[in-house]
């Protein structure tokens, strides 16, 4: 989750890079990997994510780790965002139990990382991108997969085009899932 408006698209970039690179199941030996490959990467601009994603993170049953990325450059706007980032991390880390009203409880104990930038310039942005690029490379090395091929993406496009060109199949399929016009 990014807590600076200028970084709002970073999560999408990291997700695309990570899942496209390491979201494969075939390793260098042309065998199916015995391990789960790329983790699911998702998130968004922190302030906008609070009423959807954070509900799930704080009260849902799935445990997951989160990276929080913020900027603390001394400006009032970024300081407010950075304080919100720290507050969210504390809430997710420590939680709160309310036995009288359990729907007001937050599980806590969610592993969180904080990446704090002191400025948003080419050097700090490059450093931040390099962290995630290196993570993708190390994951691929451990998993024994090629992070640079895109066979699945290409095959998906080919299969979609084949399905699209099969008009009879599409007609039958959609007639089964959509209600007829009245």
What is each model feature region?
Residues 1-182:
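A SIS-like phosphosugar-recognition module
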